[in-house]
Amino acid sequence: MVQITKNIIVNGFANKPMGTDIFFKNDGLQKPVCIYAHGFNGFKDWANFDIIAERFATAGFVFIKFNFSHNGTTPEQPETFSDLEAFGNNNYTIQLEDLGHIIDWVCSSDNPYQFIIDTENISLIGHSMGGGISIIKTAEDSRIKNLVTWASISECKTPWGNWPDEKMNEWRRTGVEYYINGRTNQHMPLHYQLYQDYRLHEERLNIRHAISSIQVPVLICHSNLDAAVPVINAYHLAKWQPAAKMFVVESDHVFGRIHPWTWDYLPKAMEDVLMQTIKFLS
C-alpha cells in the first residue's frame, strides 16, 4: 500500500514555502527517490499528477513532487494561481535554488521520511521548463544519479524567446508583460527581471553546456506533435548528449493530459512515457 503525505512545507528561495508531496511503499526498505520538477505555468498537482506519483511508488520508488516557491500557487491554494506577484518575480535561478532546497531536504535529517530514502540514488524528472532546470541542476549537483526530461526546453528563454524586438523593447520600457493562461484566462505578469536574470546568469543557464557535461544516465522523452516546445528541442538535447536515450511519442506537450483530470487512468502517450521512465530508472 502506498503511503501519501501531501503539502509538507519545505522552504525555498527567500524562505518562501513550497508545498511538497511524498509517495512511497512503507515496507521498511530504502528506495531510490525521484524528484519531479513541473513546468512553466504548471504546479505539482496539475492533471491529477497523484496518479503518476502512485505508479512510481508502486514500482518501488520514493516519489517527491513540489510547487516551486514562485510558481504563483500557495500552500493554502496549491492548484490556484493566487499569488501573481510571486509568479511575476519568478526566474530560472530562483527555481534552481528551490530545487536545491528540495534535494537538501531529501538528504537532511530534518526530513522525517529519510529512513525510507536511498540518498545515494536520487533521480530528477523535469517537464518542460522544469526539464531545463533539472538538466542544469544535474550538471551542478553530484548527488543526482539519473536524469529524465519530459518535453524539455533546450534554452532558458521561456516564454520570451520568440518575442519580436518591439515586444522586448516594450517589456524593458514598462517593466512587465503579461502571459494569458489559456485555461484560467488570467493575465499572468512577467516582470522584466526574468530577462535580466537570464542575461546576468547566461553562462550558468546554458542548457547546451550543462547537458554536454553530464556524466550520469539521461532519458529524453518528447512528443512529435508538441506545439509548445517542438520536438526539435529534444533532438538538440540528444545531439549535445550523445549517450542519452531518447523516446518519442505521438502526442502533445502534456502527453494527452488536461487539467482537471477526472479519470483514474492515464492517456496512452503519458502511459508510454511513464513506463519508459520507470524502466529506465529501474
Question: Language-model features: where?
Answer:
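Short alpha-helix in the alpha/beta-hydrolase fold that links the catalytic acid
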Residues: F49, V216, V229-K239
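Short, surface-exposed "cap/lid" segments of acyl-processing enzymes
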Residues: D27-T73, Q77
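N-terminal cap/lid segment of alpha/beta-hydrolase-fold proteins
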Residues: M1-L29
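Short beta-strand/loop motif that positions the catalytic acidic residue
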Residues: S213-Q215, L219-H222, D226
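Primarily recognizes the serine-hydrolase "nucleophile elbow" in alpha/beta-hydrolase
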Residues: D104-M168
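Alpha/beta-hydrolase active-site loop
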Residues: E85-Y113
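Acidic catalytic loop of the alpha/beta-hydrolase fold
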Residues: L225-V229, H253
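Catalytic active-site module of serine/aspartate enzymes centered on a nucleophile-bearing elbow/loop
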Residues: S251, F255-S282
